[in-house]
Amino acid sequence: MSLRNRLFQLTLVVLSLAIGMQAQDTQHCSNATLHGSYGFHATGTGFVAVGRFVFDGNGGLTGKLFIRVPGTNIGPLEFTGTYSVSPDCTVTDNWLDSTHVSVIVDQGKGYFIMNVSPSTAAADTLNNGEGRRQ
């Protein structure tokens, strides 16, 4: 095989990979991307929580959480809230008087979440959380 043919084949492979990567980067999300039931866990300093969220695909959510802080079990806490998904697959939600930001992963099969409500260093216990579609 000539050098010219090899370069042509290499160019086709690189071009195909670039197109495939661009297709993955252009995923567009909406409220409908986040729908159904998701198992949830979060950990922090002196804090752990597990629970379940149900997203309706239209910006509404319900949840049930069980929380453990040193020496105390809290819950179940049942609540409702709202969420908004941006085209870049980031999420802002509000529930239990807190605001959170999330990133949808794995084509809507999960998300990573962080509490962004105003707090003090002493009260800031949530480090990270994750939800997975059930």
Q: Residues of each region from the PLM?
A:
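N-terminal secretory signal peptides that target proteins for export/translocation
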Residues: 1-5
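Bacterial N-terminal signal peptides
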Residues: 9-18
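Mature soluble binding/inhibitory domains
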Residues: 22-134
